[in-house]
Amino acid sequence: MTTKQPTRFEAVIGIETHVQLNSRTKAFCRCAYEYGAEPNTRVCPTCMGHPGTLPVLNSAVVKKGIAIGTALGAKIRRTSKFDRKQYFYPDLPKGYQISQFDEPLCYDGSIDVVLPVEDGGEVKRVGITRAHLEEDAGKLTHAKGEDGKKYSYADFNRAGVALLEIVTEPDLRTGREVAAYGSELRRIVRFLDACDGDMSRGSMRNDVNVSIRPVGRERFGTKVEVKNMNSFNAMARAIDYEIARQEELIRSGRGDEIVQETRTWDEAAQKTVAMRKKEGLADYRYFPEPDIPKLRLSEEFISNVVASMPELPSMVRARYAALGLPPADVQVLVEDKELVTYFDAALSSSAKPSAKQVANWLTGDIMAHLKNSKMENVSQLPLSPEALGEFCAMIDAGEISGKIGKDLLPELLEKGGSAKKLVADRGLSQVSDPREIEALVDGVLEANAGQLEQYRAGKTKLKGFFVGACLKASGGRANPSLVDRILQAKLDGVPIDVA
């Protein structure tokens, strides 16, 4: 007798994100960490676990953990403790990892994530189970030696670097949802200046737990952990592959082959590959860290951290929406903290440009220039925010047209300087005198009498031809809206109203 398979399955996904906190020194010793430093040059007896050494908690790490927890709407535990998570692996010099087990620093939070258009474009609330402090392990590199044999080389520079592990509830359902969550979390830690969020360097590492179940069933399926995804796009692909793999096994009657294990994402093969059997909590033999006292936080300490927090991405979105910016522009601006700072500085410049004008140029031509020039962010531009504000205000006021602006912008982006001075030097001020525009229109109509006759015979699409001819005759300096109004009046044979 065969069991009828469900017609539809749904994925149940939770994510554990290891955020590398960018404190100047490690979590429990005074070693500085520098990505790319010579192997094993940023170590000391404490982070290497030598006998007789004692760990001392870095207060900056606690502050960054509180800030992130607060941004995630989590509760901050006034009294917490550290534990030893014990497992044997070559990149763990002490033989255990200092972590937090049953008393995490932060717990019971949530984050609102704007889902991709493909998933409805709605806001989804993702629960945060906990966020706890711990130390990182070292890094293994596998390579062949001169003798042709394979070796594993251990670099302990990263061992002891502070991490905040953020664990979600199993609230996510697709790869795109997980990528959207990860992107929002990265924005938050970057805005807080708590982590650079560089996944390619391991500053933000995501382990995803994936299971599937028939739609409508409460009980979870067997959970599989997926690791080693160095971008959000890779994460989405890995999850979607794993969902399809599990569903195929169930539908083919091989559901018992789905076991609790850790799988790695093979980017070249575009599939997940089994790594090892997944350990349970009992395998780690947690017990309280005897060398570190309980962490007791006063209300004043927590309040001071919260008071020093900068504006978060959600707050910036709300502020920009209130300015009337289109959602697409808001999304581009909030993607980068440097971009937000630059936009705000341009907007508050003495020229007082409109928000929409600044956003339009910044998210369009200027972002394209950054990409083509391979610049990391807008802070590298020769064009200052104040100069951009002046440029946009000139367009707002009709001193130059958008076309002239497009012609001028490349030079401003390459050399910086004042838009007003550049316009004056080139004699490009927009012509907005009604008498000059009227004379210009008269000249164009006189020079194109045949087309004018066709227009008045019903071929009204020729208006675009006349507008283009007027702008060309003025060298692009004529005020387009004024040209349109005066031209229309002339074509219709009605009195000119330029009020």
Swiss-Prot record:
GO CC term (a single one): glutamyl-tRNA(Gln) amidotransferase complex
Subunit architecture: Subunit of the heterotrimeric GatCAB amidotransferase (AdT) complex, composed of A, B and C subunits.
Region forming the signal peptide: none
Gene: GATB
Purpose: Allows the formation of correctly charged Gln-tRNA(Gln) through the transamidation of misacylated Glu-tRNA(Gln) in chloroplasts and mitochondria. The reaction takes place in the presence of glutamine and ATP through an activated gamma-phospho-Glu-tRNA(Gln).
Top-level taxon of origin: Eukaryota
Pfam families per record: GatB_N (PF02934), GatB_Yqey (PF02637)
A Gene Ontology molecular function term of the record: glutaminyl-tRNA synthase (glutamine-hydrolyzing) activity
Keywords: ATP-binding, Chloroplast, Ligase, Mitochondrion, Nucleotide-binding, Plastid, Protein biosynthesis
Further remarks about this protein from its record: This protein may be expected to contain an N-terminal transit peptide but none has been predicted.
Localization of this protein: Mitochondrion; Plastid, Chloroplast
Family: Belongs to the GatB/GatE family. GatB subfamily.
Reactions this protein catalyses: L-glutamyl-tRNA(Gln) + L-glutamine + ATP + H2O = L-glutaminyl-tRNA(Gln) + L-glutamate + ADP + phosphate + H(+)
Catalytic class of the enzyme: ligase
PROSITE patterns according to UniProt: GATB
GO biological process: glutaminyl-tRNAGln biosynthesis via transamidation; mitochondrial translation
Protein biosynthesis is among the record's keywords: yes
Protein's UniProt name: Glutamyl-tRNA(Gln) amidotransferase subunit B, chloroplastic/mitochondrial
Annotated organism of origin: Ostreococcus lucimarinus (strain CCE9901)
SMART domains: GatB_Yqey
Enzyme Commission numbers on file: 6.3.5.-
